[in-house]
Amino acid sequence: MDQFVITSLREYAERYETETFLFEDPSLFMHKVQGERNQEIIAFIAAGLSYGRRELFFPKIQYVIDCSHGDVEKWILSNDFCKDIPDNNKCYYRLYTNKIINTFIKRIKSMLEEYGSLRQFAISNTKEKDAVTLVEAFTKFFNENEASHVIPKETKSSCKRLCMFLRWMVRTSSPVN
């Protein structure tokens, strides 16, 4: 890597790897709930909804936290989410209907029931510690029977939001993640 790139990356890190940046970043939501599983789940939902203008999608993520009273895992496993995000065609956010988000959350529920947590799913699907294999596993799981429009159908796209979630989950020394 040349010196310009190294210097630029360090400058960006100094600018954006701060607690003040957190208030403008979707990773904020995983700091609003307690417990590793709740943090993983809300981070995954936040990443899935993170496109467009923040002032529009932030309230949709906050709605999940409010409805679940901060216990997103219990809210999902108890099917309480079906009352708050019914299986209908009303718009939830931009191109996503309630039905799309409801189906997305049902797939999260299936993952929790089968693996116990998103982390355990990741561990079970990364034998070589290969990020591409993990992204493929997530896309496959969430698109069985064409169940989800939130997670890309395949890895031919950049899978930007899914990769953002994975970055949040592996970084431990960042004040943002």
What is the meaning of each model-derived region?
Residues 1-177:
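HhH-family (HhH-GPD) DNA N-glycosylase catalytic core used in base-excision repair
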